[in-house]
């Protein structure tokens, strides 16, 4: 299963929808072997059909979507709306080797959308960049999912994060609580992303923040003198890696801890996720947070 969730494997698959399908097929086939039964966890749990299983337990919708036979072992209590928010500011173009943050965000967003669709949830997409917000209202059908994949593939990060708009009106939706999943590198100049989260928090939705970072960003594993460019402002700085690495890591650790506390204070689920990490844990986080939205 883990191989199908490996970013290097996903990057070799050119079609985003196929990548998402392979990822979720691998993830679902391993659910029964895992230990994700945390307290209060409730979701549609599946295992592969075995000869002798009661045919009445076959999930035909699952078969139609994945072309595989699965036995449904427990029921989802309710369907919800899942809104996937993608940061498409220029800093998401940051790369570690050939793999960028936005590429990882695409695969993560597509896999979460595919999994939510299998759960029977309505899925929406919101892409944030300087020129404004592209939005797809949540719907539950496969044509809508195909359009969502297309829009994810079309994302071209540029500029700074979206200027303040009427976020509350955009995300108010129905009276039911929803699940908002924000994939971002949290690069901001004036707390604009935190302000967005504060606004969304007033709607009393469940919010997940996946903070995308790269390994070279965490380790500063460059050699000698290097020139770094701010992808959003164009400003540059030259530093000696050997002299700066220790101080950099100390400041980075402090920043990540401060960010974690900010999210905790707002009761927002927060996880840092590196672009070389498999998607499995993020998918588990989604299922756990989704289980909280019971009507």
Residue ranges, per PLM feature:
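Exposed, interaction-prone extracellular/peripheral surfaces
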Residues: 1-29, 35, 48-53, 62, ...
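Acidic, metal-associated active-site segment
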Residues: 45
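N-terminal low-complexity, intrinsically disordered segments
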Residues: 58-66
